[in-house]
């Protein structure tokens, strides 16, 4: 197991104990183990990270996933963060196209190609490529789909954090986009900010919404993008074709607009001030429109009614999205009274028995146990290490250190128990966690006993980044403690 990089195929053929030992070394702060795990999803030079080592996403490069993983590791893998930033700028939308949902300034959702560095992708991945291209468009041997609302503000936020840590020289780098045009990174980031501003200004709620342009596109265009990702409390699907404002996306929009002002991306000081003022409007509208006083929790989002498109409805499902809002500055910048009103109840709910499991946070509260007949991709019988870690970061940001440590420990212990970096874990309504999904472990209970219909992807990029970030934070804490005594 020497070396800095482990091909995904070799990882799959390792024994459980071999994989577990690499994860164990990672948690001890072994940088060789960091590189070995990160090497599972490192794409060809210049392409950042593949989404996973699994059959569905092993040759897919997602904007959101790559940006969030890069942000997790920005303090100790700045080279990767820079690569992701430049790739997103390279693929940034330039024209308006309903089929691919491309818009000027918009950051991509999913990029696929039939070849990388003259190597053809496997046949199974080619089949996925052609199936998606038939509905989303494609240019010959490449496919770039833009059906996501959150990748664009996340991109701006990532650039802002990179500049804060490493200086603004990166803004002067020249990127050649996929059509051969040359622009500075600063120009690309400014175009992304203008996309955010335009969409917030045009929203009746003055929030950042998604609404698909292509009826074959993803109906829900935030990270919970499955068909049951956004359900009302009575089980009715949120109306995807009427515009939806998702709660956590408003945190990204707020951070991006604040970053735009700090980076001075406006043509003058008045425009920079406008970015900051618009962020405040997003903050006020989020707290005013989405808070459910009777539940002492934020709604999952807002949608319209198909019967009355002018009417606003709260998506009153109790979901993890509200806790993910903690990992932004939107709530952090409130006054003390507002913080007490909003933050403490959210923390109490997310750390309570309706959400907390041995593997992390359920994506939907047990209050909605009957919302679906089986364990849906983003429901109450799954926990995603990515979401659990995002919530842990938010808890730490707001001073809930013990709670953050608890969640990080659940992410770490689940990786050790499973000897894998899974996309999610199935957790039944009694709290039993299924840690193994591989056919070579016949002693494990079958997936249907947990109400699931599919296996999680192994080697998920943002599960790996979460584990590495947890390991690195612990390593630095040990180092600082040692040198302080």
Positions of predicted regions on the chain:
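Core register positions within helices of long alpha-helical scaffolds
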Residues: 72, 158, 256-259, 263, ...
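Extended, well-ordered alpha-helical scaffold segments
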Residues: 14, 19-30, 77-91, 169-199, ...
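Hydrophobic or amphipathic alpha-helical targeting/insertion segments
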Residues: 145, 152-172
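Extended glycan-interaction surfaces of carbohydrate-active proteins
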Residues: 7-61, 87-140, 201-244, 284-383, ...
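Alpha-helical support elements that line or immediately flank enzyme active sites
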Residues: 65-95, 320-334, 388-401
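Extended acidic/polar, glycine-enriched regions
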Residues: 1-2
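Heptad-repeat amphipathic alpha-helical coiled-coil interaction surface used
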Residues: 156, 163, 254, 258-261, ...
């Amino acid at each position: 197991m020497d070396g800095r990089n482990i091909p995904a195929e070799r990882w799959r053929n390792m024994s459980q104990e071999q994989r577990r030992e690499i994860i164990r070394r990672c948690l001890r702060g072994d940088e060789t183990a960091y590189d070995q795990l990160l090497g599972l999803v490192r794409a060809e030079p210049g392409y950042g990270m593949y989404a996973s080592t699994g059959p569905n996403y092993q040759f897919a490069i997602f904007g959101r996933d790559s940006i969030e993983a890069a942000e997790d590791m920005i303090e100790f893998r700045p080279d990767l963060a820079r690569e992701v930033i430049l790739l997103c700028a390279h693929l940034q939308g330039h024209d308006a196209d309903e089929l691919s949902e491309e818009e000027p300034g918009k950051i991509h959702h999913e990029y696929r190609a039939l070849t990388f560095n003259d190597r053809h992708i496997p046949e199974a991945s080619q089949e996925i490529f052609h199936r998606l291209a038939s509905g989303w468009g494609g240019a010959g041997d490449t496919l770039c789909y833009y059906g996501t609302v959150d990748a664009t503000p996340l991109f701006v936020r990532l650039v802002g954090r990179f500049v804060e840590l490493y200086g603004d020289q990166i803004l002067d780098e020249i990127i050649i986009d996929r059509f051969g045009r040359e622009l500075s990174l600063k120009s690309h980031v400014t175009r992304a900010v203008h996309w955010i501003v335009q969409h917030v200004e045009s929203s009746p709620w003055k929030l950042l919404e998604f609404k698909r342009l292509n009826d074959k596109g993803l109906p829900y265009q935030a990270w919970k993008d499955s068909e049951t990702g956004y359900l009302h409390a009575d089980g009715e699907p949120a109306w995807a074709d009427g515009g939806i404002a998702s709660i956590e996306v408003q945190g990204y929009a707020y951070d991006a607009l604040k970053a735009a002002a700090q980076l001075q991306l406006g043509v003058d000081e008045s425009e920079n001030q406008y970015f900051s003022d618009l962020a405040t409007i997003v903050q006020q509208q989020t707290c005013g429109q989405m808070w459910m006083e009777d539940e002492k929790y934020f709604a999952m989002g807002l949608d319209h009614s198909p019967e009355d498109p002018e009417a606003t409805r709260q998506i009153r499902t109790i979901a993890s999205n509200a806790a993910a809002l903690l990992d932004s500055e939107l709530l952090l910048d409130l006054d003390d009274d507002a913080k007490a009103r909003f933050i403490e109840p959210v923390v109490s709910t997310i750390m309570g028995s309706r959400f907390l499991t041995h593997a992390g946070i359920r994506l939907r509260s047990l209050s909605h146990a009957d919302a679906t007949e089986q364990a849906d991709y983003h429901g109450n019988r799954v926990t995603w290490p990515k979401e659990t870690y995002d919530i842990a970061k938010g808890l730490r940001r707001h001073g809930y250190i013990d709670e953050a440590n608890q969640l990080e420990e659940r992410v770490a212990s689940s990786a050790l128990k499973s000897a894998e970096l899974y996309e999610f874990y199935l957790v039944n309504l009694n709290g039993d966690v299924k840690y193994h999904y591989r056919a070579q472990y016949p002693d494990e209970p079958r997936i249907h006993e947990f109400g699931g219909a599919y296996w999680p992807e192994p080697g998920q990029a943002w599960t790996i980044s979460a584990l590495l970030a947890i390991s690195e934070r612990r390593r630095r804490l040990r180092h600082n403690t040692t040198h302080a005594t």
